[in-house]
Structure formats: structure tokens, C-alpha cells
Amino acid sequence: MESGLKIVIVNGAPGSGKTSFEELCQDKMGDYCQMRSTVDLVKEIALIYANWDGKKDLKSRKFLSDLKDLLSQFNDVPFRDIVRFKDVWEDELDMYNVKEHPHILFVDSREPEEIMRFKRELGAITVLIRRSDAEMAKTSNHADANVLNCEYDYEIDNNGSLDDLSAKADEFLNLIFDKN
């Protein structure tokens, strides 16, 4: 059975609207949309073992970025977590005989090398969410600083209203699933 899965790597400066865009798409697709970040497992480890308070200030962003780098270098943990998450979800969809139904996995990833690896190994589509004021903000780590140092398949301008972003989410879903 052919899979209807689209893996979409989403990137953008902190505060650019990545999660808002993904949630708008999820509102339209329901259970056929999942979201995972390459730092989700890193955050779980930081919460449980490093007593991280869950705040996303500059110091915490640097800590999480460094921890992700260590886990990536040690055993490719963040990438393998995304692959495992995708495989488990696809198995669930297959169990209900809906694997061929259009479905989307949004993956938040910042590092250009990792983004290109998702494209190469998983056939992912890449999206950059752009918001002018977010791109001018100070960054505390290499991942946030290198957001614009990558070529993306699609760019979504998020300098308008939430309704504007919702319309762009509709357009994007129609485009990637070839709906006219």
C-alpha cells in the first residue's frame, strides 16, 4: 500500500510563527497531521535529568542547542527519534488501513546539514516561515543564527494577520497534496 505521507521540515527564526503555521495546518487535517521537533526528545532529557525549568530564554536555548549537538554526535539521537516517530505513526495509520490517505508530519529542525539530510534520506519538503521582526532578534546559538543559511522549497511570509497565515496554510496544503 502506497503511503500518503509528506514530511515537511519547518524552520524559521524564534517567534516567526512556525508552530502557528503547523497548528493551522493541523486544524485543517485533523488526525492526519502530526508535529515533532528534533529537540522534543532533547527537551524531555533536559527536564528529567538536568532539572531544566522549561523556559525558552536565551540561556536555555543555548543549553538545549548544545545538548542536541552532543546527542547528535554521540549516537544520532535527534534524527533517529524523528525516524522512529514517523515509523510508529505510519504503523498506526496502516493498522487502520488509512496509510494511503494524505497525511503530513511537520518536523521542526534548525541546522542546515540536518535539514538537507531529511531531504536526502526521507524525501522531505522544506519550508521557511519568515517574519521580519523575528529575524532581527538576537540569537544565542548556532542553530538559531543559521536559519537563513539554507535553501528551502517553500517560503511562507508571516508578516500579516493570523487569517492571512491561515489562508497560506490552505494554499500550502493544496499545493503539496496537488489539490486544485
Predicted features and spans:
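Post-Walker A helix-loop "phosphate-sensing" segment adjacent to the P-loop in P-loop NTPases
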Residues: 27-35
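ATP-dependent small-molecule kinase phosphotransfer cores
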Residues: 37-103
